[in-house]
Amino acid sequence: MWGDIDRKFVNSYSDASVNTLTQQFTADIRTFKLDFGAQYTAKLSAKENITLGVTFSPAHKIGGHPELKKILTNSQTSVSDTTSYGGGFDLSLPNTFGVGVMWSHNDKLKLGADYTLQQWANVQFPTFETVSGASTFALRDNQFSDRHKITLGGEYCPSAFSRKFFNRIHYRAGVSYATPYIKVNGNDGPTEISASVGFGVPIINVFNNRSFLNVSAQWAHSSAKNFISENVFRISVGLTFNELWFSKWKLE
């Protein structure tokens, strides 16, 4: 994983004699992320089985060498003063744990539940502070909270190999609840509740029976105490394709 972070905050005033303050936070990420997982399926009966899964992503430093620049400018005098802080420490990713279970009946009905924990409370993040006239930009604790996410979902397909088109469609629905990991002025950020419905249309021919055109609609609501709430509606269209699309015939 790689990328640049560049955030800029500008405080300007209508009075030209007052200095404009620009704060610029930058970091350059060049690192990796490891994900481990295990899965086991147990047969409950001739038509039922249950699948258990666990995942783990270890915490590690991702570099970045974050830097903060404070720039004071005056439009009347054209004088600019820049002070730089930081650059000698690294950002980090948290430990992430996941566990899930899925129950399947006759390859028609599937119900599942997932739980994910991201241990952001153990992650330090750089902040700027001025104490007794001394300004510092350094890594500090208690900048985040642990993030918990619970997801419930299901899928129903009347008959995957039926001659009738609508019997081969996969109908899906799900809900989720997630707590925030960010803090705003020391308060927890917005929690998020979401719900989605959708369907997968199989693309079937003599060479391919595992490709799907997926369409879904999602509603997400985020809110926090003393903050505005937000409602978001999304429409997603995707294609899950079979690797046989890229195969070529070979005659000998």
Sequence positions of predicted segments:
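Outer-membrane beta-barrel porins/channels
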Residues: M1-E252
